[in-house]
Amino acid sequence: MSAFENLSPIIQALLGTGFTWGMTALGSAPVFMVKEVKQEIMDGMLGFAAGVMIAASYWSLLAPAIEMSEGGTLPAWLPPAVGFILGGVFLAGIDKVLPHLHLGMPIEAAEGLKTTWHRSVLLILAITLHNFPEGLAVGVAFGAVAADLPSATLAGAVALALGIGIQNFPEGTAVAMPLRREGMSRLKSFWYGQLSGIVEPIAAVIGAAAVLLARPILPYALSFAAGAMIFVVVEELIPEAQRSGDTNLATNGAMLGFTVMMILDVALG
């Protein structure tokens, strides 16, 4: 751990999101064994992912942002509120522009700018859209540690990366399985499934670098990442987690995911 502590925050963020990317790849790997996962299982897994993201948004991002804002010239609630709204608006803008397709939807229901891209490409872009704020959150968390603020700890940043990695497993499955079900080869389904997570290391570097270059934006950056993550949860994960019609599965999964992430953050952070 001491060797990891001595690395630059950008390298730490890269390693942290390298783990989360690896978990996306691991989640894509079941296509080598089965062609389909029961919808009920997917609903529970996606609910779990939603719970992890909600907990991470508060415990790892919003709470530190509020604490950092206390004692400043502005009201303590203002920087986190502004950053949170901007994060949601940013993701909403990308959602309107980037062509993508939600899981289980027909090609006619594709969102964003009109395109002739194949269904599989649109599915991959949808999950890639999920992963950007997750990578950004990890990068900002490691950047905050380098800023030497008491509310930001290396263990907390590691806990966030661990939680994001855990919830990336079902997201990898959610990309790879539909591709396999539509007739794509096992190898291609796996390849595109893991590829959806490649945006996380890129976003992490952006987040860590932004915080290092401008420390005063840290409360805004943390809450920005939280707003973007909550947008993804409400816009995509929760609806996708209820496709079987049994809302209890998604709800129980979300409760479990929230609890796991809360334990990780409190125990390690």
Where are the regions that the model predicts?
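Intrinsically disordered, metal-sensing/regulatory segments
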Residues: 1-269
